């Protein structure tokens, strides 16, 4: 492994495969977030099995997603794509009556060149239900980019004007240029971040995605936009290029330090002087001390899975941990520039070595480095957790951070709850004398 530099972050790129979930898994949280939607995944039996395994518990509740399974006739072009999709969408409209239908393309629709973008406008005009096409297929780098693809497609559907004139007037009387935040977060977290900005005198004009498709925010040229997750670079690019918005390049609101930096950057762009953020951050750090004392001085190694690695590494560095390596499937250095700068500043503040950032890491090489470095914790994808545990290495599934509430000041405790769980478990087992896995001769 390269030695970490004292003056700059070290970037490497290996030739490993992308070891991650399929991005169509984004359906599992987006269909719950957008309440009046229906998601139609167009793929093969493999896609169906994956969705059943990922979301099988919800099938009996008649969820708002379905699988359009491709057959031999589809692949050999014997069946008419328009006719088949029309039949399915009419059935969806009759049974569920959604405000929007999302077509989620898969690897197979890419390979057989199915013209979903060409079919959708014609069918939309016929059945009078908006159809949004998102190619959230397994050719992406990380499963979280499925959400990025869907939000980028939704961004182009955001209205230019509100139908309700009174709402339009309220936007015009806003004390600053309208601000739209993008990223799918649970409703309580959306409320928390909106209120944090409101305390500073900054009003959020809307969120992408909104709770309902019919309530998408107005996005005009010159509006400010800010992301809440590191994996939304495609959405940011779409908003800047297609809607001519101004992106606020801020660290992401993960951990007290990241949340404060995120709010401060938005305040600086809006020419608002932030109030009370330093005291708020100090109070949060003080309340986390019972968790931080468990991990201070410990080491962590990120194998790379969901593109949250840099933000989590920065937060854990601030908690006193040493980060040996940040494996990440893909790094958009422009979109994450502010986050990388905060990571470097945090390492300098804590007087620890700069971690090496490895794009597209080779897992065989990573296992060798883990064996040499012997970190106290490895944050990894589900595929590698059990093999590493069998070798006596503490692990945590990175996918848990995707589904947990980790944004904002108060949710930092949830991050530390996840990080410390394997360490607390092993501490309890050792007290019981159960720290040896195999029978000793």
UniProtKB/Swiss-Prot annotation:
Keyword Plastid: yes
Biological processes annotated in GO: light-independent chlorophyll biosynthetic process; photosynthesis, dark reaction
Coiled-coil stretches: none
Subcellular localization: Plastid, Chloroplast
Subcellular location, principal: plastid
Swiss-Prot/TrEMBL catalytic activity: chlorophyllide a + oxidized 2[4Fe-4S]-[ferredoxin] + 2 ADP + 2 phosphate = protochlorophyllide a + reduced 2[4Fe-4S]-[ferredoxin] + 2 ATP + 2 H2O
EC number: 1.3.7.7
Textual note on the cofactor: Binds 1 [4Fe-4S] cluster per heterodimer. The cluster is bound at the heterodimer interface by residues from both subunits.
Associated pathway: Porphyrin-containing compound metabolism; chlorophyll biosynthesis (light-independent)
Subunit structure: Protochlorophyllide reductase is composed of three subunits; ChlL, ChlN and ChlB. Forms a heterotetramer of two ChlB and two ChlN subunits.
Protein's recorded name: Light-independent protochlorophyllide reductase subunit N
Organism in which the protein naturally occurs: Pyropia yezoensis (Susabi-nori)
């Amino acid at each position: 492994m390269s030695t970490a530099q004292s003056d700059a972050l070290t970037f490497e790129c290996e030739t490993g495969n992308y070891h991650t979930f399929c991005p169509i898994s984004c359906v599992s949280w987006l269909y719950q977030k957008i309440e009046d939607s229906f998601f139609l995944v167009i793929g093969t039996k493999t896609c169906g099995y994956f969705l059943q395994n990922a979301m099988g518990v919800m099938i009996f509740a008649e969820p708002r997603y379905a699988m359009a399974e491709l057959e031999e006739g589809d692949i050999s072009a014997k069946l008419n794509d328009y006719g088949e999709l029309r039949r399915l969408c009419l059935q969806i409209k009759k049974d569920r009556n959604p405000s929007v239908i999302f077509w989620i393309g898969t690897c197979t629709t890419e390979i057989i060149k199915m013209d979903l973008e060409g079919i959708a406008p014609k069918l939309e005009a016929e059945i009078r239900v908006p159809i949004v096409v998102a190619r959230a297929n397994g050719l992406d780098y990380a499963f979280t980019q499925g959400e990025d693809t869907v939000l980028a497609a939704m961004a182009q559907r955001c209205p230019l004007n509100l139908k309700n004139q009174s709402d339009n007037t309220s936007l015009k009387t806003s004390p600053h240029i309208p601000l739209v935040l993008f990223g799918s977060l649970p409703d309580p977290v959306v409320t928390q971040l909106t209120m944090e900005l409101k305390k500073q005198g900054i009003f959020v004009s809307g969120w992408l995605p909104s709770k309902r498709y019919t309530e998408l925010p107005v996005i005009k040229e010159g509006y400010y936009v800010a992301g809440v997750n590191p994996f939304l670079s495609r959405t940011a690019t779409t908003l800047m290029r297609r809607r001519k918005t101004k992106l606020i390049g801020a660290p992401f609101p993960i951990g007290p330090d990241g949340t404060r930096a995120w709010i401060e950057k938005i305040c600086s762009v809006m020419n608002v002087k932030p109030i009370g953020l330093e005291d708020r951050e100090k109070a949060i750090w003080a309340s986390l001390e019972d968790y931080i004392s468990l991990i201070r001085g410990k080491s962590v190694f990120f194998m790379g899975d969901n593109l949250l690695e840099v933000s989590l590494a920065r937060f854990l560095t601030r908690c006193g941990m040493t980060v040996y390596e940040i494996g990440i499937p893909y790094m958009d250095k422009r979109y994450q520039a502010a986050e990388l700068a905060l990571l470097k500043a945090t390492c300098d503040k804590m007087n620890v070595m700069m971690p090496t950032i490895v794009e597209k890491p080779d897992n065989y090489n990573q296992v060798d480095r883990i064996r040499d470095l012997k970190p106290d914790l490895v944050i990894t994808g589900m595929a590698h957790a059990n093999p590493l545990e069998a070798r006596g290495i503490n692990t945590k599934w990175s996918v848990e951070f995707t589904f947990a509430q980790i944004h904002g000041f108060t949710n930092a405790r949830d991050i530390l709850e996840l990080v410390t769980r394997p360490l607390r478990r092993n501490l309890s087992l050792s007290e019981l004398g159960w720290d040896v896995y195999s029978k000793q001769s």
